[in-house]
Amino acid sequence: MIKLGIVMDPIANINIKKDSSFAMLLEAQRRGYELHYMEMGDLYLINGEARAHTRTLNVKQNYEEWFSFVGEQDLPLADLDVILMRKDPPFDTEFIYATYILERAEEKGTLIVNKPQSLRDCNEKLFTAWFSDLTPETLVTRNKAQLKAFWEKHSDIILKPLDGMGGASIFRVKEGDPNLGVIAETLTEHGTRYCMAQNYLPAIKDGDKRVLVVDGEPVPYCLARIPQGGETRGNLAAGGRGEPRPLTESDWKIARQIGPTLKEKGLIFVGLDIIGDRLTEINVTSPTCIREIEAEFPVSITGMLMDAIEARLQQQ
């Protein structure tokens, strides 16, 4: 029997209709896996050994009562076959410390999804720089004058922090906007933090597409997140409307070009953000949108993921 651990935000607070981690747990349980639940505070290192206080978990598709704990134990993480790192951002120093603990278990043979080193290496905004032929025009800087020059060149730009999620602190600055200076100062904290500028993509009106990639293989359907009521952000957390769709030809092209790199880096479950035919983000920490896509199309994304995990476990 496969022992699967999951590190996540409190399961009592999730919305099971939309929660991708919950969908993964349902599929793992359906396959007869033993589920071990952990929050960040349950992980610890003792004399170099990664351990955790885990609670054995049962889950069910029931909006009143979706989980129950059936046991608890303190164990070496190396006792688990696979651990899903599903803690939501912020990607802060605490998150980084947790990846080091998980890496100690990985060295003993536990499969970590996604690979701890790659979680540290691949910032969701900056990692797109390795695929700059696929992205919008992009500037990463702390320098206000450079931001101003970029804005003057493109006249309609998007500014965002490198560590936000859910559309937080994303600004659109159009031609003649008197607020560029204050936005630049706010995002860079007066030149002490990097931010990202990209030329505005009018295709956002048709949606910001979340394309999921499972161990290098694109899922054939995506979720387009369409901005509502004059918003420039499609993120569901910012009020965008989700619309599942088949991948377009350019979606396939982008996902297939990036897929082999993701696989090689042990990034087994990844969400690409695509606007029109441009890649804007590579989400590696805790990608979502499984449930919305599975509800609309005959595809089991969680099945693809567990198949990929089982294949990797057999290779070890």
UniProtKB/Swiss-Prot annotation:
Cofactor dependency: Mg(2+); Mn(2+)
GO annotation, cellular component aspect: cytoplasm; cytosol
Domain ATP-grasp: 125-310
Chain sites annotated for binding ATP: 151-207
Catalytic activity: gamma-L-glutamyl-L-cysteine + glycine + ATP = glutathione + ADP + phosphate + H(+)
Cofactor: binding comment: Binds 1 Mg(2+) or Mn(2+) ion per subunit.
Gene Ontology MF terms: ATP binding; glutathione synthase activity; identical protein binding; magnesium ion binding
Pathway: Sulfur metabolism; glutathione biosynthesis; glutathione from L-cysteine and L-glutamate: step 2/2
Gene3D superfamilies documented for this protein: 3.40.50.20, ATP-grasp fold, A domain, ATP-grasp fold, B domain
Effect of P227V: Loss of activity
Residues where Mg(2+) binds: E281, N283
Entry keywords, A to Z: ATP-binding, Glutathione biosynthesis, Ligase, Magnesium, Manganese, Metal-binding, Nucleotide-binding
Documented effect of changing C289A: No loss of activity
Activity regulation description: Inhibited by 7,8-dihydrofolate, methotrexate and trimethoprim.
InterPro entries per record: ATP-grasp (IPR011761), ATP_grasp_subdomain_1 (IPR013815), Glut_synth_pro (IPR006284), GSHS_ATP-bd (IPR004218), GSHS_N (IPR004215), PreATP-grasp_dom_sf (IPR016185)
Gene Ontology terms describing biological process: glutathione biosynthetic process; protein homotetramerization
Pfam families linked to this entry: GSH-S_ATP, GSH-S_N
Listed EC numbers: 6.3.2.3
Annotated family: Belongs to the prokaryotic GSH synthase family.
Xref: PANTHER family: GLUTATHIONE SYNTHETASE, RIBOSOMAL PROTEIN S6 MODIFICATION PROTEIN
Oligomeric form and interacting partners: Homotetramer.
Protein name in UniProt: Glutathione synthetase
Source organism (scientific name): Escherichia coli (strain K12)
